[in-house]
């Protein structure tokens, strides 16, 4: 059975979905997507379940979410292996992802009490109310952790949720849904709707949906924004990636700097929203030495299948089709005059395994300002730090920016001048924390950061003035007279 609608597992009635191993081509999951009628039924059930769920005491909602975290812990081996098989990521990475899912529960609880506490000051009070029915669109790069970062705070706030995972990671979503059911969620509170574009379109068009929480490409995010134009009553939270820059400024430990660059560019085969896409290196002998060392170390990165032993640092990208697009972007930069520092290889066209590629594009004209979601690192040389900041900000995106440098004053300047939601110093760009907001500006989002700030878009504030005493004020406003006909009464 493909979908979980109103507590029942059902076969789909929509388009056929087949998920294969990114490397071997083995079929891992198959079914049919949710039809428009099934999406409508799920929305209706969620709307019906919402009043009781929203009124349920917070402590009871918390207990269910904490039970889910305990079930994640118990089932971590099965879930981490499913993520690895679907995404191609090595085991060590997917085990870390499941741990992040577990940690998200306690973090979301703390965030709720910090971001959305009930406040009373005299006759004034503030409390927070859930939106209603929220649609969560999950990405494929972190198919467990990233949807979890929307679902957990949404449920804690008292919302009902319609979860549409990526069609490239249906198995992970199915396992997570079964764990939620075992945790004791009331019927109708959380629904799983598998499928591709048709299912997603049907979900967005549902009038019962009060908000959409999305993580994915800028193209899809912009499409969602256009579709919801003229509907300001609906919450829309978009996280859309970036063309992120990492600046290298005279590091005093070249190997440490190289390690940060590799972690920033090639972890998860370059399939993290905050991965470095552009590496900015000062012109001169020191910059040349850094790049030579980077290319030499990156050439030794072990690339392999999710279950290879010894474990690889980098697995495959999500599909052979994705590998083809990434490799085409690599070739396009060579054709445009880029200088290859480390050649990207695609050994088997039927496989999604790529090796890291590094190319100097300093002299390439009209370089596309796009997020290449894979292990392709573009080097740009700069003259001075002012030039470096100009290059870093020369993008329509604004998710992440980083600096490798021993000079604190350079980082202080970057904090003021960088146009990015995440700005790191001597840390990988991919080192985001759930205890901080996660999001960007420009084409990277719509000012609805997730992680620690997810509670903000899962509930709306209600302000109240209240008094138990009903009486006239001691002093009336000018022009009012309550003495008229008083004696006659």
Curated annotation (Swiss-Prot):
Query: Which chain positions lie within coiled-coil regions?
Result: none
Q: Does the keyword NADP apply?
A: no
Query: What species is given as this protein's source?
Result: Erwinia tasmaniensis (strain DSM 17950 / CFBP 7177 / CIP 109463 / NCPPB 4357 / Et1/99)
Q: Which UniProt keywords apply?
A: Arginine metabolism, NAD, Oxidoreductase
Tell me the protein's name: N-succinylglutamate 5-semialdehyde dehydrogenase
Q: Which reaction does it catalyse?
A: N-succinyl-L-glutamate 5-semialdehyde + NAD(+) + H2O = N-succinyl-L-glutamate + NADH + 2 H(+)
The EC code for this enzyme is 1.2.1.71
Under Gene3D superfamilies, the record lists:
Aldehyde Dehydrogenase, Chain A, domain 1 (3.40.605.10), Aldehyde Dehydrogenase, Chain A, domain 2 (3.40.309.10)
**Which Pfam families has this protein been placed in?**
Aldedh (PF00171)
Sorted alphabetically, the Gene Ontology BP terms of this entry are:
arginine catabolic process to glutamate; arginine catabolic process to succinate
Asked if the Swiss-Prot or TrEMBL record annotates the protein with the keyword Transcription regulation, the reply is no
Q: Which InterPro entries match?
A: Ald_DH/histidinol_DH (IPR016161), Ald_DH_C (IPR016163), Ald_DH_CS_CYS (IPR016160), Ald_DH_CS_GLU (IPR029510), Ald_DH_N (IPR016162), Aldehyde_DH_dom (IPR015590), SuccinylGlu_semiald_DH_AstD (IPR017649)
């Amino acid at each position: 059975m493909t979908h979980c609608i109103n507590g029942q597992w059902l076969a789909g009635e929509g388009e056929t979905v087949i998920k294969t191993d990114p490397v071997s081509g083995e079929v891992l999951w198959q079914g049919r997507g949710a039809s428009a009628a099934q999406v409508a039924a799920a929305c209706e059930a969620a709307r019906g379940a919402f009043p009781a769920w929203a009124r349920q005491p917070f402590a009871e909602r918390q207990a269910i979410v904490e039970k889910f975290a305990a079930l994640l812990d118990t089932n971590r081996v099965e879930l981490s292996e499913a993520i690895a098989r679907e995404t191609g990521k090595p085991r060590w990475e997917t085990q870390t992802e499941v741990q992040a899912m577990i940690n998200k529960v306690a973090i979301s609880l703390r965030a709720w009490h910090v971001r959305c506490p009930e406040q009373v000051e005299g006759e004034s009070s503030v409390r927070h109310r859930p939106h209603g029915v929220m649609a969560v669109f999950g990405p494929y790069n972190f198919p467990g952790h990233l949807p979890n970062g929307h679902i957990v705070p949404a449920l804690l706030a008292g919302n009902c949720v319609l979860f549409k995972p990526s069609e490239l990671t249906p198995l992970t979503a199915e396992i997570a849904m079964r764990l939620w059911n075992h945790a004791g969620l009331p019927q109708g509170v959380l629904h799983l709707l598998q499928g591709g574009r048709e299912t997603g379109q049907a979900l967005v068009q549902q009038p019962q949906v009060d908000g959409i929480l999305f993580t994915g490409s800028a193209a899809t995010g912009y499409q969602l924004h256009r579709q919801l134009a003229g509907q300001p009553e609906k919450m829309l939270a978009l996280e859309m990636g970036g063309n992120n820059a990492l600046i290298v400024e005279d590091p005093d430990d070249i190997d440490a700097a190289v390690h940060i660059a590799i972690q920033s560019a090639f972890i998860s085969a370059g399939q993290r929203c905050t991965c470095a896409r552009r590496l900015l290196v000062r012109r001169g002998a020191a910059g040349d030495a850094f790049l030579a060392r980077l290319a030499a170390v990156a050439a030794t990165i072990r690339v392999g299948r999710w279950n290879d032993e010894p474990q690889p640092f980098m697995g495959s990208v999500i599909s052979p089709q994705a590998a083809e697009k990434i490799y085409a972007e690599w070739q396009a930069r060579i054709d445009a005059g880029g200088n290859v520092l480390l050649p990207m290889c695609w050994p088997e066209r039927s496989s999604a395994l790529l090796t890291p590629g590094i190319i100097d594009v300093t002299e390439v004209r009209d370089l596309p300002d796009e997020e290449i979601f894979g292990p392709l690192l573009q080097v740009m040389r700069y003259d001075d730090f002012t030039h470096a900041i100009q290059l870093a900000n020369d993008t329509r995106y604004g998710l992440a920016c980083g600096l490798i440098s021993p000079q604190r004053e350079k980082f202080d300047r970057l904090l003021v001048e960088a146009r990015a939601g995440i700005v790191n110093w001597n840390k990988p760009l991919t080192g985001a924390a759930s205890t901080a907001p996660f999001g960007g500006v420009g084409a990277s989002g719509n000012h609805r950061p997730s992680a620690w700030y997810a509670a903000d878009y899962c509930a709306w504030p209600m302000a109240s003035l209240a008094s138990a005493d009903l009486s006239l004020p001691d002093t009336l406003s000018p022009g009012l007279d309550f003495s008229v006909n008083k004696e006659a009464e």
